[in-house]
Amino acid sequence: LANDGLSAKYSWEDIYNTAAGTNPYRYPNQKFYTSDYLRKNKSRYDVTAEFEGGGKFAQFYTNVSYYREGDFLNFGEGKNNYTDRLNVRGNIDLQLADWASGWVNANATYYNQHGSNSEFWKAASTLRPNRVAPFIPLSYLDPMDANSLALINNSRNIITNPAGLPAGKYFLGATQEDQTNAFADMYAAGYNTWTSRQMQFDTGVKFDLSSLLKGLSFKTMFAVDYSTSYTTSLNDSYATFGVNWTQFDGKQIIGSVTQYGEDKHTGTLNSSNSAERQTLAWTGQFDYVNSFGNHNVNATLLANGYQQTISGEYHKVSNANLGLLVSYNYAHKYYADLAANVVHSAKLPEGNRNAISPSATLGWRLSEENFLKDVNWLNDLRLTAGYTVLNQDLDISEYFMYKNIFTATGTWWGWSDANNSIQTSDSQRGGNDKLGFIKRKEFNVGLNGALFSNRLSFAVNYYNTVTDGLLAQPDYIYPSYMHTYWPVSTFVPYINYGKNRRTGVDFSLGYKDKV
């Protein structure tokens, strides 16, 4: 600072006494990374128990595990820091009949993380050692200073034998710049516990319907995924004291103290940061697999849906699908896949909430043709081409974007700004009952192969993806009176207008061998 023409921040007396350690409470040199505050290691233990058994019709397995982990901090509330987790997981496999089987899976997790309301590690990396003395002995108080004694004696945070200091009683020190600190927090600010509870459950049955039609089967499943978390905390505030040092009879004593803050202790645990999430899912599907000579057929008829409830959000996230896939190949040489999916979205207006997404793929295994079959170094060579139109609402960010919106708190206007101003009722968006799904149209052609006893593999794919119908409010395609700048108002709706294209080539090359 002297080089800049400013007065020195620290006097030579401050520097000397800090280095000499003559009075660590007046000239602090606070340490963080010592054995007074930190353990050399932290403990962790794990316990796991497994149970299994069953008979002809049912088999079960259960796993119970628990772990608890301590912390490096070893003083104040920090020595009580811990993390623990209890997990119970089990499943039951059922053989109901020769043609029917089922299962039940369940998992529950209980997780807790307890810690002090002190940001010790942050302070250790940022707080300068000479900024503040966190604890000051009561013995330095002037016994004739009634005002200072009264302030200190009224404090509820007189710390007995704090870590790293000689035995005795201490009050919480401070300065005007640092009225609280991480060490005082550790003894007087309280603690918090973050709690998480999770539960997953699924059950299903599977039926072999070959007695009705060869290769036919059916399975259905229901699942629940639930989680909740919250924080409980004891949030105390506390008084700290800045001191004015003086010299009396050759000894350094405290001439006066200044109180910062107040002692507040309710004794009541606070609950905050509560969050909850629940997902319910169901699926049911028929599968058909059969071969007729060189003709191989595979088909799936699938219906599924899920609904997700999230705390703090009004709308549930819902998804429902009905899909059909038919796959055919001739002698594993020529392939054709046809698929269709019926999708539903509550984000769209009535009449436009359902759509069909078709997909088709063709494949040709060139390596099985006569003109390549005898090429010894060629193990596999396939040519594929596919086209898909996917109707999706992932890019529709909110519900009711097809609705018109008015506000009663629009632009201020009037004859007098002081007495007669009122707000207009303005349109903020027009409605559009024709709003539809965003379509993702994808065409791809690929060549895949394996060479030299399958040691070398490669894949080359060309793709051309067009996303059509992205939502926008293009006011420039509407008459100018549909949008005004004063008052600020618009009747322009969201429409399916945006379009983008992504095209390119992917190439991958792999090699594997035994050494």
Model-derived segments and their meaning:
Residues 1-75, 269:
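Residues embedded in well-ordered regular secondary structure
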Residues 1-26, 98-125, 193:
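N-terminal, post-signal-peptide soluble/periplasmic segments
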Residues 6-31, 46, 128-181:
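Acidic, glycine-rich flexible loop segments
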Residues 81:
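Short, Lys/Arg-rich flexible segments
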Residues 91-100, 106-110, 142-235, 244-515:
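Extracellular/periplasmic, surface-exposed regions of secreted and cell-surface proteins
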